Amino acid sequence: MRFKRSCSLGVAAAIGMSVLAGAAAAKEMTTGLSFDFNRNDSGFTPIFSDYPNEQGVEEFYELRSGHEEVPIAEAGKGLFLSGNNHSDDLFMGYYKELSGLVPETEYQFNVRFQLATNVENDMIGIGGAPGESVFVKCGVVSEKPENSLDSLSHFRLNIDKGTQSQSGADMIVVGDLAKEEINRPGEYEFNEIETKVIARTDKAGTAYLVIGSDSGFEGITSYYLDDIYVSWANTSEVSVTRGDAVKMLFDHAHRWDEAVGTPTFTDVAWDAPYAEAVAWAEQNGYLGGYGNGFFGPEDMMSVEQAMVMIYRLFGSPKVTDAGVLDSYKDASQISPWARDAVAFSITNKLLVPDGKILPQSPISVKALRYAIGQIGMAD
C-alpha cells in the first residue's frame, strides 16, 4: 500500500507583489512533465551542500548519487542519493531545469514524487531519528542551484532551503524519511509526496525544480527519488481551495505567540497541512463552515468568501463608501453578507477588479496573494 502525503500551498516567493492583481477569477490552464527514470536520469543533476571544503571530504562523507535500480519489485530505476551526515546539517538532492515558460512570470507549481526509503519510524539515532529527523524538502527557484564557500569554508547553497525542520524562502518541508507503511520491515517502500509551491521564472523563462533532504541525523542516509511529476500554471489562472486560502492568510497574519487549538469541523483532519490555519480562522471568526460540521477544505474559495475572510481580519470596520460597488454591473451578484467586505476590499485596493467583480467565481492565486500582501496598508 502506498501512502500519499500532501502538503498545502507553499509560498516560495515573497507574498507582497508590486503588480496589480488584475482579474480575480481563475481560469485553469496547466502544463506538466513526468519522469519515470526507467531509461535515464532525465537531466536531473545531483547536488550536495552544508559540508566543509576539505581534502577527501566526499569520501569521508560517503557522498553518492546515481541513476540506479530502486530495490522495490517492478519499480524500475530512480535517482539514488546517499551520504554520511558528519556536519549534522547535510543537504543532498537533485535539481532539474524547467525551460520554455513565460519570462518573469509567477507560477504555481504542483509537484508529486515517490521517495523510496527503508527507514522505520520511531527509531533512535545520534543527533535525531534516522527517519523523522531527515526532512524532505521541495522547491522551485529562478536561480540555478549552486554551491559557494562561506566564511568557514563550508559549501552552502545559493538558495534559501531553510535549516533542517525549518522551511526556507525557496524550499519547504514536505515530509521526512520515515516509512509511512511497515509492510516489510527493513526493506524499501515508497512514500508518495505531493505539494504546491509558488515561484517566479527568470528573464529567459526558466525555473529549477529542487527536491532533496536536510538532515539532523548524524549517520548514513540513503534513498531513491522516482516518478516525479511537475505541472505549472500562471497564478492568475489557477484557483485556490478554502483550505489553502486560509493557510495562506494564516502564514501571513498569524502571530507566533497566538495559541491555536484544533478545528472542530468533521471534514478537516487534525493532521491536514491547513488544520491549524482552519482552527485559527474558526476561533477568530475569520471564516466559518457550511453548517452541520462541514468546512469544505477542498472546495474552491470564491472571490467574495476571500474578501470576507480578510475583512473580518481587519475587525469588520464600518463601510462608509458602499457606493463603490455601483460602478460594477455584476455587483448585484454579491451575497448580502459579503457586500460590506467587497466594498471595503475595493476601496482599500485589496481587490482590483478588471471591469467585473465576479464575486461567486473562484479567486485566483494571484489575486489572493495580492490581497493578503496589502494587509497593513489598508485603512
Label each residue range with its predicted role.
Residues 86-102, 191-195:
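Short beta-strands within extracellular/lumenal beta-sheet-rich domains
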Residues 63-93:
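Surface-exposed, low-complexity/disordered Ser/Thr/Gly/Pro/Asn-rich loops and linkers
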Residues 187-190, 201-202, 215-232, 361-362:
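Extracellular carbohydrate recognition
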Residues 18-25, 234-276, 283-339, 347, ...:
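Feature responds to low-complexity, polar/acidic, surface-exposed segments characteristic
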Residues 106-120, 213:
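A short beta-strand element within beta-rich, extracytoplasmic domains
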Residues 152-206:
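Short, surface-exposed tryptophan/glycine-enriched loops
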Residues 178, 210-219:
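Short beta-strand-plus-loop segments that form exposed binding edges in beta-rich domains
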Residues 27-56:
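Extracellular carbohydrate-recognition regions
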